[in-house]
Amino acid sequence: MTTVSMRDMLQAGVHFGHQTRYWNPKMKPFIFGARNGVHIINLEHTVPMFNEALAFISNVASKKGKILFVGTKRAASEAIKEAAVSCDQYYVDHRWLGGMLTNWKTVRQSIKRLKELETQSVDGTFDKLTKKEALMRTRELEKLEKSLGGIKNMGGLPDALFVIGADHEHIAIKEANNLGIPVVAVVDTNASPDGVNYIVPGNDDAMRAIRLYTEAAATAAKAGRGQDLAVQAEQDGFVEAE
């Protein structure tokens, strides 16, 4: 089972919250105290809560579930994409478009258009167009890829959301809540934990902390997927030699 230790979290700076004047009182149970005007998060809470979240992620993946990694702020976007790709899951790393989950029918049409343009860009269709028309389609393709590239092969709504920055991604969390999709989210001291099923109290700005979360989540998803493949192999009559 994938787990993260307190030492890992301390080294990554998970315990450093926001300045005390920006705090959200709903995070009080998870705050240890303050140092130099900055809230310190109580890792005695974070460690077991994150490990519980990782067990949940692993369980979702073991049932062939789809996990959507969400992190659109600059500090998180690269790590979110890398983690999702590494475990064959899905991601939104640029901008959350309102209705991405709650208006899936419309999003599906945009994904269809994205795939059409991808095909046209490689099958010679673009070469037959005027320069202006080809440029317009290339720009449309780039725009759609930026927004929907991480979910174009999701094939339906996800079974869980893994979110970096509950405050920044509040629209995504609200949409998931409306649809009954469970949410795992890193919640800093300035954010509200409302609507988050698996709260991970921690720093959501430091690159090292973000990478700790995303890499652990990807490892947990891979471990879960491995369990699924092992069960499948057993059912198919393939048992790995000791």
UniProtKB/Swiss-Prot annotation:
The answer to whether the entry has keyword Iron-sulfur is no
Q: Which UniProt keywords apply?
A: Ribonucleoprotein, Ribosomal protein
Any GO CC annotation of this UniProt entry:
cytosolic small ribosomal subunit
Chain ranges passing through the membrane = none
An individual GO BP term: translation
What InterPro entries does this protein's entry cite?
Answer: Ribosomal_uS2 (IPR001865), Ribosomal_uS2_bac/mit/plastid (IPR005706), Ribosomal_uS2_CS (IPR018130), Ribosomal_uS2_flav_dom_sf (IPR023591)
Any one Gene Ontology MF annotation carried by this entry is:
structural constituent of ribosome
* Protein's UniProt keywords contain Translocase: no
UniProt superkingdom = Bacteria
Q: Which family does it belong to?
A: Belongs to the universal ribosomal protein uS2 family.
Name of the protein in its database record:
Small ribosomal subunit protein uS2
